[in-house]
Amino acid sequence: MKGHFIVLEGIDGCGKSTQISHISKWLPQSGLMPKNANLYITREPGGTTLGKSLRDLLLHEHETNVPAPLTELLLYAADRAEHIHSLIQPKLDKGDWVISDRFSGSTLAYQGFGRGLDINLIRRLDAIARQGLVPEITIFLKISVLTSMRRRAKKSADRMEAEGEGFLKKVASGFSRIANEEHWITIEGEQDQALVSDEIKLAITNKLKNYISNN
């Protein structure tokens, strides 16, 4: 049996990292995973050795060496193609489970709605990079731009996070639209962390029980 692929999406500060940590402790004990399956946690960009170099280039390079928007898009597509080829697909083929902090939705939200690049172009490039792979579950942690800025106020910002409120509003609007169009599971990320975690666990349980029973 092939493994399952779960993705968490949302603007910066929505709590993805915290919730992925909670899920990674819960899932192996949940009864959903086969006993012989392993759980792998990864992220985009940066889920592979090559991806780590691309992450530094995309998010942490000096301001005098900033890639053009189209270059940025192509680098994210390259990161995803390598990520799927080297890590995600091999693990799924073995029956293991994978949780990723960001996937295709982030590219649409940040490069499409945030940067203003052509959405159809992004979808075509993403389809090439994904080679047919689609997550069984994508969970969108929805928070306001003000909450995002408040939560990140005392943290050092990467290049994308430092784009400012106007950019973030476009990205947040993009995420909401994509979540609706793609039928993601939307969870209110403004709640207490424990409540968010409980809702995620319930959503995963319901979704995978239905998926497993139909396959």
UniProtKB/Swiss-Prot annotation:
The entry's keywords: ATP-binding, Kinase, Nucleotide biosynthesis, Nucleotide-binding, Transferase
Binding site for ATP: G10, I11, D12, G13, C14, G15, K16, S17
Any matching Pfam family: Thymidylate_kin
Class in the EC hierarchy, top level: transferase
Catalytic activity line of the entry: dTMP + ATP = dTDP + ADP
EC number: 2.7.4.9
GO-annotated biological processes: dTDP biosynthetic process; dTTP biosynthetic process; dUDP biosynthetic process
Recorded superkingdom: Bacteria
One annotated Gene Ontology cellular component of this protein: cytosol
Any one Gene Ontology molecular-function term assigned to this protein's record: dTMP kinase activity
Keyword ATP-binding tagged: yes
Signal peptide positions on this chain: none
Keyword Transmembrane helix: no
Coiled-coil portions: none
Role, per record: Phosphorylation of dTMP to form dTDP in both de novo and salvage pathways of dTTP synthesis.
Family: Belongs to the thymidylate kinase family.
Protein name per the record: Thymidylate kinase
